[in-house]
């Protein structure tokens, strides 16, 4: 019986050892699975963080691309405007000379020498106007037209029954446009 007891004790010891080994293996597995889970969670956090950064970077890139496209469009428009209005400075400088030509041509010619001088001035005046017309310069029509503050500068007001209300009655100085831009507004007298 003693042998039997010893054998039972041995079997119990072995079972305890096996149980301890199994428990150790199970606890190692659970530790590994906890570690794996926490490692997986860390990796997922990292992936989420990187995806957020990627999304932010893509958004920033799209905004920069749109800004660059707008910049290119603006530069192109500025270039076209510069080309379109390249003669503006020159035309502005020539306008006083044209005004003086017009005033000089209004003088009455008393003799043949004066008449030929006026004819020469008229030819030069017409050539200047033709050159300016080729560049897109045109005189602003004023007398009889409705007053337009973009094209006319009112220097006087009168009451005249021959004209409509707010119509230009008289032009003191011609106005000019280059293409669609007013270079100098017409100085006018306006009916009330």
Swiss-Prot record:
Primary location recorded for the protein, binned into one broad class: cytoplasm
InterPro entries: GrpE, GrpE_coiled_coil, GrpE_head
Alphabetized GO MF terms: adenyl-nucleotide exchange factor activity; protein homodimerization activity; protein-folding chaperone binding; unfolded protein binding
Pfam families noted in UniProt: GrpE (PF01025)
Entry's Gene Ontology cellular component terms: cytoplasm
Basic and acidic residues: bias regions: 1-20
Gene3D superfamilies per the UniProt record, alphabetical: 3.90.20.20, Head domain of nucleotide exchange factor GrpE
Subcellular location: Cytoplasm
Spans annotated as Disordered: 1-39
Keyword Cell cycle included in the entry's annotation: no
Keyword Chaperone part of the UniProt annotation: yes
Residues spanning the signal sequence: none
Record HAMAP family: GrpE (MF_01151)
Protein family per UniProt: Belongs to the GrpE family.
Entry function: Participates actively in the response to hyperosmotic and heat shock by preventing the aggregation of stress-denatured proteins, in association with DnaK and GrpE. It is the nucleotide exchange factor for DnaK and may function as a thermosensor. Unfolded proteins bind initially to DnaJ; upon interaction with the DnaJ-bound protein, DnaK hydrolyzes its bound ATP, resulting in the formation of a stable complex. GrpE releases ADP from DnaK; ATP binding to DnaK triggers the release of the substrate protein, thus completing the reaction cycle.
The protein's name in its UniProt record: Protein GrpE
